[in-house]
């Protein structure tokens, strides 16, 4: 894991969410959570977002909220969520404006939460809000890059 004293709150928040599944009685759930957690730091550190796009995104930091529906078992989720966390961190988005909601392999919500109110097709389903209004989604993989797709949604 990243140094607990020197890493973004948004990453710590994800670690806390994944830790719930690490302690699951269901060994498959625990195994997928471990796989996700083990790769999270590497994906977060290695992703190099476009700095010019990040500079444009920073002006939206206080306007944006992101809710992600994902599955620990999903390779797209395990790749895109750490990258998204890095983009949000460099944008200056507060960790309390980021939420992650888990679904199982049949895409049923793990908890009775935001995911339960949505029709879930592909994951991750990244739902982007600007000033409390949903402005769009990035589903499964970005069209260009996470930061470019976010900028297009927030303009």
Where is each model-derived feature located?
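N-terminal targeting signals for export/organelle localization
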Residues: 1-52
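Local sequence-structure signature of Cys/Sec-based thiol-disulfide redox active-site neighborhoods
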Residues: 58-92
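Thiol-based oxidoreductase modules, predominantly thioredoxin-like and allied folds used
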Residues: 66-72, 95-110
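Extracytoplasmic/secreted cell-surface and envelope-processing proteins
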Residues: 77, 110-111, 136
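Thioredoxin-like thiol-disulfide oxidoreductase module
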Residues: 100-122, 128, 153-154
């Amino acid at each position: 894991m990243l140094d607990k004293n020197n890493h973004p709150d948004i990453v710590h928040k994800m670690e806390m969410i994944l830790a719930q599944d690490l302690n699951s009685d269901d060994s498959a759930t625990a195994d997928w959570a471990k796989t996700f957690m083990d790769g999270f730091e590497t994906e977060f550190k290695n992703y190099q977002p476009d700095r010019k796009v990040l500079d444009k995104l920073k002006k939206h930091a206080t306007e944006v909220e992101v809710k992600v529906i994902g599955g620990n078992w999903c390779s797209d989720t395990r790749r895109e969520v750490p990258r998204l966390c890095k983009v949000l961190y460099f944008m200056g988005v507060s960790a309390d404006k980021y939420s992650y909601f888990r679904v199982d392999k049949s895409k049923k919500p793990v908890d009775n939460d935001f995911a339960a109110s949505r029709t879930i097709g592909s994951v991750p389903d990244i739902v982007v809000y600007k000033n409390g209004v949903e402005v769009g989604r990035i589903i499964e993989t970005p069209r260009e890059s996470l930061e470019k797709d976010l900028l297009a949604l927030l303009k």
